[in-house]
A protein has these predicted regions:
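N-terminal signal peptide c-region/cleavage motif recognized by signal peptidases
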Residues: 14-17
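Secondary-structure end/capping motifs
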Residues: 222-300
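Pocket-lining segment of extracytoplasmic ligand-binding domains
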Residues: 164-255
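Short, glycine-/small- and polar/acidic-enriched structural segments
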Residues: 23-164, 169-172, 176-182, 193-199
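Short, solvent-exposed loop/beta-turn-alpha elements that line the ligand-binding surface or hinge
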Residues: 51, 202-207, 272-280
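Bacterial N-terminal signal peptides that target proteins for export
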Residues: 1-7
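C-terminal solvent-exposed extensions
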Residues: 293-314
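Signal peptide processing junction and immediate N-terminal pro/mature segment
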Residues: 19-21
Length: 314
């Protein structure tokens, strides 16, 4: 596993991209409505991609395999916000996918919840209960494995897909504990209809670990490398805008279709900007399921603006 991870994130520096004509990139974006799924939309609205000579075609997915599969098949150039376990598994099987940047470090945004009448108030109450995560290999899969190992409990883990569908399953009694990321479920929590029983931030070991990455198809790396460099630079610029421009919250409230106050809470309380840095990929010391010791640590040379490196060196 250590060798696999070391190879997987062998990011190699390349020269900064020169100005070029508009080039199309097809991008899969997971979980529309999440704060970190809006950065491509920001880049389009602000004209950043146009300035960089890029046309972006977006495919929105529910995350996990639905994001990773099309990039492996080659129908998509880039897949955003992939759980690192799923990417490692795909690479280990020889799939044509490579990490191009970190996406999320730490797990401040994810949480697990239950209905108050269920009697489940903390993770320790979940022995034999059904506890949700989005999909195998996703970041919620990784976080939940760490949480249950830390709490020493034995729930039944269930892949439930996206946050809206998971909420429906909890409210209808199909599962005991759901997962979410803001702004989803915040209103139900405020209304007392649900209670948080665990947070990703409860796992100290994840605070400095990359849990999600952005990846590209191998052929895209070979044929569109210059465009991928420009894409990452625009992504970095869009993230900066989202944390500095006063209109960012209004923009997000409109996209997520939530009140402005919930949009503000989502960004300020659950998505610290430093967690969304792109240049440094860090890995776990031990695999959460096998216990095998692994280590990933790569810091891209960001002297050319923080996104002049695209990884493939395999």
């Amino acid at each position: 596993m250590k060798k696999t991870l070391a190879l997987l994130v062998g990011l190699s520096a390349i020269a900064a991209a020169q100005s070029a004509g508009a080039e199309t990139l097809k991008v899969a974006v997971a979980q529309r409505g999440f704060w970190n799924s809006t950065f491509i939309d920001i880049g389009l609205k602000q004209g950043y991609f146009k300035e960089a000579g890029l046309d972006i075609e977006i495919l929105y997915t529910e995350g996990g395999a639905s994001t990773l599969t099309p990039v492996i098949a080659g129908s998509i150039d880039i897949a955003m916000t992939n759980g690192i376990l799923g990417v490692v598994a795909a690479y280990a099987k020889g799939m044509p996918v490579r990490i191009i940047s970190a996406e999320a470090t730490g797990a401040a945004e994810a949480f697990w919840y239950a209905r108050p009448e269920s009697g489940i108030n903390r993770l320790a109450d979940t022995n034999g209960k059904t506890v949700a995560f989005s999909s195998p290999g996703s970041s919620t899969n990784l976080i939940l494995l760490q949480l249950i190992n830390q709490a020493k409990v034995a729930p039944k883990l269930v892949a439930t897909g996206g946050a809206p569908g998971t909420l429906t399953q909890v409210m209808s009694g199909q599962i005991d504990v759901g997962w979410s990321v803001p702004p989803f479920v915040l209103q139900q929590l405020a209304d007392g209809k649900l209670v948080i029983i665990a947070r990703g931030s409860d796992v100290a070991a994840l605070a400095e670990q990359t849990i999600r990455v952005n990846v590209a198809n191998v052929n895209a790396l070979k044929e569109k490398r210059d465009a991928l460099v420009r894409f990452l630079k625009v992504l970095s610029r869009s993230i900066d805008w989202a944390y500095s421009d006063p209109h960012a919250i209004d923009n997000y409230a409109e996209i997520a279709k939530v009140p402005r106050a919930l949009a503000q809470q989502t960004r300020d309380d659950f998505f610290p900007k430093q967690a969304l840095q792109l240049s440094e990929v860090k890995g776990p010391r031990r695999h959460p399921e096998t216990g095998a010791r692994v280590q990933v640590h790569h810091r891209a040379d960001d002297r050319r603006g923080g996104a002049g490196n695209v990884g493939h060196s395999l």
